[in-house]
Amino acid sequence: MSIGVQSSGINISHAELSRLVDAGKSEQGDKAVRDGGRALARADAALAAVVGERVAARRDAVAGSGAQRVELARPKPDAQTRATDRRTVSGLEREHKRLAASQTPRVTGMHDALVQRHVSLDGAKAAHGEGVKRAAGDAPRAAADAPQRFAFADDKAFDAMLALGAAMQKNVQSDLAMQGKLTMLAHDAMMSAAAQDRSIGAAQMTAAIAGGALQATTSLGGAMQQMKSLSTKSMSIEKELKPQAELKQFHAEQALELRGINKPVLSNDEVSHVKIKRDTGETVRHEIDHGGERMSDEHASVLAQEAPARQHRIDMHGMRHEENLVKAGRQQMKGDLLQSGGQIGKNQIDGASAQQQGADRAEQKEDENAQQTAMAAASTRDEAAHRSREAAQKAIDAAKSQVANDNAVAAQVAGNLRT
């Protein structure tokens, strides 16, 4: 197989074409898109150099023989196509301004390959001029070190696509940073909500411990006061009521003596006296009338004198007992007040704890809302990035189509050279 240019008599064999293509391949082969593009560019440059060298030699020979020299004009893209491309890229750029940058490394890698392979109009023209000058005598070096640019990449729409890719690469880091900030914000809000949960639990535990301790203390104090009240009543019964009862009994017996009831009488052995023990412990002896019908006047007088004193002592025992009851009542009241105060204090602690828990729950709600907002923003950001990736893919497809069109133009140039 060979490629021939009929008007110039140039024939390039298949082996030579393979050698030229192999000379422009990268050491890494076609493992990556960028390396494959570079290999293709070098092969095209080498082919153009060889063709240019032989065409130049043939042209010089023809010029020496006096033949007419024919110059081929560079093909120009259709104006309508260029306008359509510009409108397409303009729309992509406007869409890109509303969307986030792409996060897919594969997409950014393809943009790298496109940017490195193609340049703007001025760079393309300069590269083309240099290629024409070096075509005659520098073919081997051009095959190895040819710039990775295309002379036909002079469409402004195509340059706009490349600029779009470069701008998207710059925005990748900002998009990732924003995603990280939103994620950290959601994480911080979640941690704050968890801290508020722990704070609410701690407040409940503190209120329970403090209220329980206060109520236990006041209940114990109230119980002690109630025990004192019962002890006072018991002491009053023992020291006041019992002596009072004994005095009342003795007083009644003495009253019966004064009325002549159950008065002592002489027995068969004719005892002439009787001994009476007073409440003071003193024993008094009274003489008994031998007639046995009545007490002596002295005996009756003594009993009559002691009756008011006994009645006074009985009344004083009753008064002291009443005082003891009043004292016991005060102690009972203190105990009740202590217990009631403990319950009131516990209620106050519960109220303060409930207020603190309410404030913590309000902060927890705010943190949860902040977390939900951050998650919603992150989701929106991710959706925008997804739409941006789709737009970037469309831009790449458009760039590929432009490259295919430019390759078709190059093929047309080669066809014109053959004819």
From Swiss-Prot:
User: Looking at the Swiss-Prot or TrEMBL record, what is one Pfam family this protein matches?
Assistant: IpaC_SipC
Question: Annotated region Disordered: where?
Answer: 62-94, 338-402
Q: Does the keyword Lyase apply?
A: no
Q: Name one GO cellular component term.
A: extracellular region
Claim: Secreted is one of the keywords in the record: yes
What InterPro entries does the annotation carry?
BipC/SctB (IPR005427)
Protein name in UniProt:
Effector protein BipC
* Native source species: Burkholderia pseudomallei (strain 1710b)
Its gene is bipC
